């Protein structure tokens, strides 16, 4: 099943109770990224234009490393920016 929730006006999609969490909205906030990480997903997808700056994109990896206790390798394997 797929569910949707709004955080800071941005839609977060969750598939199969957290097997996959995705957001495709532009200019997402830290709150959106944190809400996604709190779902403890196996895989995460963002659209490239979710981020206003390249630094914002780098920050998602750090957020997931902290919230999920993922290693550098797990972050690279489990997060996709398309």
Language-model segments: what does each one mean?
Residues 1-82:
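Accessory, often C-terminal, charged low-complexity segments
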